[in-house]
Amino acid sequence: MSDNDQQLRVSKIQNGTVIDHIAGGQALNVLAILGIDGTSGDSVSVAMNMPSDRLGHKDVVKVEGRELSQNEVDVLSLIAPAATINIIRDYEVVEKGRVERPSVVEGVLECPNHNCITTENEPVDSRFAVGDDGVRCEYCDTIIRDDLPAHILAE
């Protein structure tokens, strides 16, 4: 089988976003971050545990008709730090780049500390400092290391 045959296991998209080099097994978490649950009508292709020289195994997500916001890319970088984002228009890659981990994410994660000011009826957006081993709430210092997708705020 040629390299081209392997690359076309998932068909090309006309317009939208391709998220490549996601660590194997993380594609469903990427869909959760993007709020894609199958009910919105988004056309999505997912390839999981594909062979990868760089990662061993990788996942790929293709979303037709949608370009990611910077907030989405920032949160995505927390669970897929090696991901590459490709913007597709008329079947051509018009923009390509690796995700960059921000130093802070704001308003996209929910603090698990029930006593944190961001979880009460206060008009305060959550704010987390991004570290190498997790994220830390800047209000109560609670650290989230595991299951980050479970703490994503619904839009």
Swiss-Prot record:
One of its GO terms (molecular function) is metal ion binding. Its cofactor is Zn(2+). Signal peptide: none annotated. Keywords: Metal-binding, Pyrimidine biosynthesis, Zinc. It comes from the Archaea. One of its GO terms (biological process) is pyrimidine nucleotide biosynthetic process. GO terms for cellular component: aspartate carbamoyltransferase complex. Zn(2+) binds at residues 111, 116, 137, 140. Binds 1 zinc ion per subunit. Gene3D superfamilies: Aspartate carbamoyltransferase regulatory subunit, C-terminal domain (2.30.30.20), Aspartate carbamoyltransferase regulatory subunit, N-terminal domain (3.30.70.140). Pfam families: PyrI (PF01948), PyrI_C (PF02748). InterPro entries: Asp_carbamoyltransf_reg_N, Asp_carbamoylTrfase_reg, Asp_carbamoyltrfase_reg_C, Asp_carbatrfase_reg_C_sf, Asp_carbatrfase_reg_N_sf. Involved in allosteric regulation of aspartate carbamoyltransferase. Contains catalytic and regulatory chains. Belongs to the PyrI family. This is Aspartate carbamoyltransferase regulatory chain. The lineage of its organism: Archaea, Methanobacteriati, Methanobacteriota, Stenosarchaea group, Halobacteria. The gene is pyrI.
